[in-house]
Amino acid sequence: MILGLGLDVVEVARIQRILAGPPARAERFLARVFAPSERAYCDARQDRATRYAARFAAKEAAVKALGTPEGVRWLDLVVERGSGAPSLALDGLAADAARRLGVARVHLTLTHDAGVAVAAVILEGTGP
């Protein structure tokens, strides 16, 4: 059963402006929003702003799918990249919210084209 659905679109230029802006501001944003593994992945790519935008969209989509629970931090939501499709790891209050909803699986898809990054998150489970 589908327990939650979230969709988000991020303009890549918005993230590019942050990355190209004052270094201290960019670092604060990256440290507050992205886990070290996400940063390592994005920073190793030529299109890093696009990669960051897709991950930011994934986090926004996940929060929407969870019902916008209070207190969830960006770092409670981590996009992981194994050998296949990206996945979303939940920690902290995000994991607590998922448990309360009865979430068994989190599905994530990312795409980017024409200056935007899009993410969709589907929460699947049996319910509370």
From Swiss-Prot:
The protein's name: Holo-[acyl-carrier-protein] synthase
What role does this protein play?
Transfers the 4'-phosphopantetheine moiety from coenzyme A to a Ser of acyl-carrier-protein.
Its family? Belongs to the P-Pant transferase superfamily. AcpS family.
- NCBIfam families in UniProt: acpS, pantethn_trn, PRK00070.3-2
One Gene Ontology term of the biological-process aspect is:
fatty acid biosynthetic process
Q: Where in the cell is it found?
A: Cytoplasm
Species annotation: Anaeromyxobacter sp. (strain K)
* Gene symbol of the encoding locus: acpS
A molecular function (GO) term: magnesium ion binding
Q: What is its EC number?
A: 2.7.8.7
Chain residues that bind Mg(2+): 8, 60
Q: Which Gene3D superfamilies match?
A: 4'-phosphopantetheinyl transferase domain
The signal peptide, as residue positions, is none
Reaction(s) catalysed by this chain, per the record, are: apo-[ACP] + CoA = holo-[ACP] + adenosine 3',5'-bisphosphate + H(+)
- Which GO CC terms are listed, alphabetically? cytoplasm
Q: Which UniProt keywords apply?
A: Cytoplasm, Fatty acid biosynthesis, Fatty acid metabolism, Lipid biosynthesis, Lipid metabolism, Magnesium, Metal-binding, Transferase
S-S pairs: none
Q: What class of enzyme is it?
A: transferase
Cofactor section: Mg(2+)
